[in-house]
């Protein structure tokens, strides 16, 4: 999904902007950095319970924590990493609002991606490092230093 498709999916959900944060690939997609296959959200417990009661399919994450799924959207109470945790309150307070949607900040997203170690996360870390260097005004270099 490109940024417009992700935004359309999120707008259709009509979630309270102060109760969730877009994380993962969808946060990159909305910023126009790459496409994504799904939309991961971290939400406050009251919204999680409301969506669960509304019939969202329950799932269990690799760390044993509960999640919800409907279509392309997956809902969590936290991120799937113990070593780089952030509370939902912290995520909401530090979210970057784009197109009316709260996105995880790039530094936090990069920290999570570094802990996962999957091939797609390694590619995302390289992308995020370039974007953050550019944002800081530093010269852009490839991962091999050129």
For each of these PLM feature ranges, what is it?
Residues 1-146:
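Compositionally biased terminal segments of proteins
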């Amino acid at each position: 999904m490109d940024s417009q498709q992700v935004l359309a999916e999120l707008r259709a959900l009509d979630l309270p902007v102060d109760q969730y944060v877009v994380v993962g690939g969808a946060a990159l997609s909305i910023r126009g950095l790459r496409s994504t296959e799904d939309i991961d959200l971290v939400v406050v417990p009251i919204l999680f319970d409301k969506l669960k009661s509304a019939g969202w399919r329950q799932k269990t994450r690799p760390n044993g924590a509960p999640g919800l799924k409907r279509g392309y959207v997956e809902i969590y109470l936290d991120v799937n990493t113990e070593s780089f945790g952030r509370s939902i309150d912290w995520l909401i307070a530090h979210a970057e609002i784009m197109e009316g949607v709260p996105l995880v900040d790039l530094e936090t997203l990069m920290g999570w991606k570094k802990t996962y170690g999957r091939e797609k996360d390694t590619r995302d870390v390289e992308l995020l490092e370039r974007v953050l260097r550019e944002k800081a005004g530093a010269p852009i270099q490839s991962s091999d230093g050129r």
